[in-house]
């Protein structure tokens, strides 16, 4: 079945995740002083909460494309990136367990989401790949190999910096733009 559609199961799950992401955005961005009770943990300073909230809004927009879009090839590249993010969030949760609002409904929702997502998101990607024609549409821009290689290089550098910051956060705390 190579018709480049987004399958109903993929759409439905993406739609549910969008609801979680929009809710997280609302709490983190508009109610940063209430993250201790309304979110999985208390985030300080408030600017960090708003920063995370804006990232969740970006994720909601991307996954809304999977929930409401038409073509699989337009959204398929997001799924591996979301998988990496959810794995990192699960690891961060386990590493910083004591900082979470354990036993609260927001934390339980967080924990379930980040235990299930690292498996569910790649499973959806594999499931929906059977519809991919691997052919660009006539209106699609074909990116040159040079641009793709430069982008991969930059992406690799960013991934390296993020990985270092993830495991050695003190290296970045002093240069974080707000404290």
Which stretches of residues belong to each language-model region?
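Short, Lys/Arg-rich, polar N-terminal cytosolic tail immediately upstream
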Residues: 1-7
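Residues within membrane-spanning alpha-helices of integral membrane proteins
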Residues: 11-14, 18-21, 53-56, 79, ...
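Membrane-interface interhelical loops and short amphipathic "cap" helices
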Residues: 30-45, 99-107, 167-179
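Structural signature of hydrophobic alpha-helical transmembrane segments
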Residues: 45-55
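Hydrophobic, ordered structural segments
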Residues: 58-145
């Amino acid at each position: 079945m190579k018709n480049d559609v987004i399958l109903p199961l993929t759409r439905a799950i993406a739609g549910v995740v969008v609801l979680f992401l929009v809710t997280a955005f609302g709490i983190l961005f508009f109610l940063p002083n209430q993250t201790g009770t309304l979110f999985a943990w208390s985030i300080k300073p408030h600017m960090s909460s708003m920063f995370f909230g804006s990232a969740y809004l970006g994720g909601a927009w991307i996954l809304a494309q999977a929930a409401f879009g038409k073509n699989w090839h337009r959204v398929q590249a997001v799924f591996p990136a979301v998988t990496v993010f959810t794995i990192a969030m699960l690891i961060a949760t386990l590493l910083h367990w004591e900082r979470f609002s354990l036993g609260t409904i927001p934390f339980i929702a967080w924990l379930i989401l980040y235990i299930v997502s690292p498996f569910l998101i790649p499973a959806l990607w594999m499931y929906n790949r059977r519809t991919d024609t691997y052919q660009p549409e006539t209106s699609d821009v074909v990116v040159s190999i040079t641009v793709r290689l430069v982008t991969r290089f930059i992406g690799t550098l960013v991934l390296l910096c993020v990985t270092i910051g993830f495991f050695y956060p003190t290296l970045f705390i002093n240069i974080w733009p707000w404290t």
